[in-house]
Regions:
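PLD/PLD-like phosphodiesterase catalytic module centered on the HKD motif
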Residues: 1-139
Length: 139
């Protein structure tokens, strides 16, 4: 998590438009709480975070000007080393237009999280998040 966080922050500092979408409705509450733990550092650095409101979202997209990677790969140890997950590299401009349209629609139906909102989350959740962080590499 720290390597990914650091990479996102460094990209933002280089002027990259970095936005993150996470599910508002989780499949596992403890995973949502662990994910939410990292919002603060990202938000403080100007990275915009959104929660997808219509339901659960599991897709992952990295979108650049001339290419994209689309898949369902979780950014964690288990997905990279224990599971056989994958994504596809897209560089076809026509298909990229479809990815961009889907991307824009996903942001349209997502709710942006502010730093103030994150900072003022319930104390009980904050305590639980600090506890769960210890186990984050195992989940």
């Amino acid at each position: 998590e720290e390597t990914l966080t650091r990479s996102l922050v460094e990209a933002k500092r280089r002027g990259v438009d970095v936005r993150v979408i996470t599910p508002n409705i989780p499949d596992k509450k403890h995973v949502k709480w662990m994910t939410e733990y990292y919002y603060g550092e990202l938000l403080k650095c100007g990275i915009r975070i959104y929660e997808y409101t219509p339901g659960f979202v599991h897709s992952k997209v990295v979108l650049e000007e001339h290419c994209a990677v689309v898949g369902t790969i979780n950014m964690d140890y288990r997905s990279f080393y224990l599971h056989y997950e994958n994504g596809i590299w897209i560089y076809n401009e026509e298909f990229l237009q479809e990815v961009r349209k889907d991307f824009d629609e996903t942001f349209r139906v997502s709710r942006e999280i502010t730093y103030e909102e994150w900072k003022n989350r319930p104390i009980k959740r904050q305590v639980m998040q600090h506890f769960l962080k210890v186990f984050s590499t195992l989940v």
